[in-house]
Amino acid sequence: LERCKTAKEAVELITSLIQTYGQAGNCGFDKKFYYDNAFLIADETESYVLETAGRNYAIKKVMDTATISNCYSIRDDYNFASNNFNGDFKATYQNNLFTYVAGAERRKKTSFNILMENDSPFNLMAKALSSHSSDKITVNKSSTDSVCMHAGNMFGDQTTGSYFGEINSCYFVT
């Protein structure tokens, strides 16, 4: 993605790579676990949600606020879809049982609702990324319903680090 100058170029690169090479690779630590990817891609002027299913994908331009959380959100409101797809992308590709067990819709709703609150963008991002589904969640007790998941317990695939920043014309992450 470092070769892209805009969010639109990044979307075009990712979709080109997906169509050429597909998606593969076990993302489970000690078990076989595969899933398709979603991307929230932004530059200083525009943002996109890109959701994938194998070599298929749907792209939706973000008009205001968007969140992703391991569940499909693009229905028939996409700006572009691969292979002349016509229909409801989420209804076609989402595994409802996996999505429910993973708490994906609940996490997505939580992060979106927090971002809609009236506060500074940095405070809202920090609040969203550190939010738990219950006051009972601690470092020793995790939940797939929480945006912030602590490693350990019966779950071994949590993301324990988050990052956010203000997008300017010059932006570096190392």
Which residue stretches match the model-derived regions?
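Phosphate-interacting basic helix/loop segments used at nucleotide- and nucleic-acid interfaces
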Residues: Y21-G25
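C-terminus-biased signal that marks the final domain/tail of proteins
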Residues: V11, T15, N26-D30, Y34-N37, ...
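Structured soluble/peripheral alpha/beta segments that form catalytic or ligand/cofactor-binding pockets
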Residues: E46-I59, T159
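Well-ordered mid-protein domain cores that form the structural environment of catalytic cofactors
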Residues: L1-T20
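Active-site and NAD+-binding cores of ADP-ribose-processing enzymes
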Residues: I59-T65
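Structured loops at beta-to-helix junctions and adjacent beta-edge loops in soluble globular domains
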Residues: A42-E44, T52-A53, V62, E166-N168
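Short polybasic amphipathic segments
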Residues: F39-I41, A58-I59
